[in-house]
C-alpha cells in the first residue's frame, strides 16, 4: 500500500482527544484506529503487534540476520488529533497546486498572503481539507510513514536493518501521550518521534511548559444596588490578563521567544476560571515567567482581598535539549540520511512539545523529532504534500539501515 492510500485510510477515523476527559484514552474512538493499526502491523509481519487496554499500539520489526547486535531504534507517532478543530467526518482532497490562492472544496481557501511558503509546492500534489475540519496530518502522516517504511523493509529483506520498535500513542495532543507508555514493550534505548512539520525539519529543542489554572472569586450583588459592594469576577479576571505583557503572546512571538497564552475563560460575576499556558525554551526565563504570574496573583489578592485569586501552577514538560546533548549522533545521523536522499535538513526549535520530550526526561529514551512533511497543523488550512510523505518513507528506511 502506498503511503498516500494509507494516510487517507487513517484520517477516516475520528481520533480527536479531549482536554476534559479523565478516561484513558481520553476518547474511546482513538482505540478504533489503534485496533486497525495493530491488526495491520500484524498482517504485515511485525512481531508482538497489539494494542494494550489503554490504547497504546506496540510492535517490533526484528533485525535482519547478522544485524541483531546493532542497538534497536524506536519510531513513534501519535494517533489522536487536536481538539481545537473538528477531526470528525474528514473529507480530504488531493489537488495539484498550480500556484496562487487555493480554494478549498466547501469553504475558505489557502491564501498566499497568509501562507507565503505555499510557493514551494507549485506543481506538487497536496492533500488538503474541505475547509470544515482539520486534516489529521498531525500525526497520521507520521503513522502512515512509519507503517509504510516497515512494509518496505519486510518486502525487501535484502536491505539490512536493525531492530525497530514501533509505538503509536493516544492523547499526545492533550499532553498525556506518554502517561502510560510501557518501556517493557519497547526494546529501544533511543528513538525518533515522527511528528514535525515541513520536509527537512529536525527538532531537538522544545519549550519548557507550565499550565495555569486561575480561579477568581467575586461577590455578586444586584447591579441596581452594587455600588462599593460588587466584585465582578469577570472584570477581575480581565485585570489579570491586562497584567500579562501584550507583546509576549503566541501571535507576537517566534523562534526561541517564549510567551503567555490565555486559552480559556469561563464563568460569571461570582466566579471565573481562567486557563493559560506558559512557554519558553530557556529554563531561567521559564522560571521567571512563572514567578511573574505568581507575583501578579499576589498583587491582585492585595487589591481585591486575600483569597480572591487562587492559582494552580503546574509544570507540564521540559526542554529535551539537555537530554539530547549527550546523544547528538541521533541528530547527525538524521541530517546525513536526509542529505543522502536529497533533502536539506533544517534544525528548528519546536514551538510546542512532543511525546519525545517527555520520553527523553521521564524514561531516559533520547527522542528527537522528525518532520512528517505537513503544515498548518490544528486547523482547517492543514495540508501535506504527497511527495513529502513519500520522501519521509525513504528517510525512515535509510535511518534504520545498517
Predicted regions and their residues:
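Metal-dependent amide/peptide-bond hydrolase catalytic core
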Residues: 233-402
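Phosphate/diphosphate-binding glycine-rich loops and adjacent basic-rich segments that engage nucleotide
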Residues: 192-226, 233-234
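Active-site metal-coordination/substrate-binding segment of hydrolases
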Residues: 67-163, 168, 391
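N-terminal capping segment at the start of a domain
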Residues: 2-28, 128, 317, 375-379
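Glycine/charged-rich beta-loop-alpha catalytic/anionic-binding loops adjacent to active sites
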Residues: 119-133, 215-221, 341, 374-377
